[in-house]
Structures are given as structure tokens and as C-alpha cells.
Design a protein with these regions (language model features):
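N-terminal core-binding DNA-recognition domain of tyrosine recombinases/integrases
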Residues: 12-27, 33, 37-112
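A detector for short, charged/polar N-terminal pre-domain segments
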Residues: 2-9
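Conserved segment of winged-helix/HTH DNA-binding domains
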Residues: 116
Length: 116
């Protein structure tokens, strides 16, 4: 599916804002752009745009795409979405934040292999 110009514009504006306001590294900005673009592509397959996202859309996306993904990866992507929608709400691009009801995936505690 093809991402709409509106969705691409929203992603570009958000990433630019992060760079200007927070000075995030190029790698971080690239990862944010990739995660949002993958989600926007999935949304295009549902005939929806990024700024039309509902909590149900995000739940479906995570259940379809992250069943076999590590919790750390799913949580990183959730953080990207939370930051995007918090920004979009502040900028008046969306009326509500669909990430408010979503919870992070549970991660197993890591025990060190050896203690020295």
C-alpha cells in the first residue's frame, strides 16, 4: 500500500521537530521515521491515515506485527507512537491521543550470566 502525502508530511514534520527541539541523533531519528513509516504503510492497507489512528488501530497493529517480536522492540515502537501522538496533540494535528490506554509489553528480568 502507498502511504498518503498527509501521513508522510506528518512524519517528516515530527522528525524535524524532534531534531530542532531535542537534537536527537541521526540514528534515533532514522529509527523513529522507520517505525512510523511502517505503521503508516500498515494503516494505508486499512484505508486510513496516520492522524486518523484510534487505540483499536494500534492494538491491531501490535497484535498482528509484534506477536513474534521481542518485548523490547515492541516497547520501543510504542514509545515512538506515544511521542508522535503527544506531539500531534500539542500541535493540534489530532484531537486525542490514541496511545493513552496502551500499556508496555512485559519484559523478562535479565539476570547477569556471571558476577565478578
Amino acid at each position: 500500500m502507498v502511504i498518503t502525502a498527509s501521513s508522510l508530511s506528518g512524519i517528516d514534520t515530527f522528525v524535524d521537530a524532534l531534531w530542532l527541539e531535542e537534537g536527537l541523533s541521526k540514528n534515533t531519528l532514522t529509527a523513529y521515521r522507520r517505525d512510523l513509516t511502517l505503521y503508516a504503510t500498515w494503516l494505508a492497507g486499512q484505508n486510513r491515515e496516520l492522524n486518523q489512528t484510534t487505540a483499536l488501530d494500534l492494538q491491531l497493529y501490535f497484535s498482528e506485527r509484534h506477536a513474534a517480536t521481542k518485548a523490547t522492540t515492541a516497547n520501543r515502537r510504542l514509545t515512538v507512537f506515544k511521542r508522535y501522538f503527544r506531539w500531534a496533540l500539542r500541535e493540534g494535528v489530532v484531537q486525542e491521543d490514541p496511545t493513552l490506554t496502551l500499556q508496555s509489553a512485559k519484559q523478562a528480568l535479565r539476570v547477569p550470566k556471571t558476577l565478578t
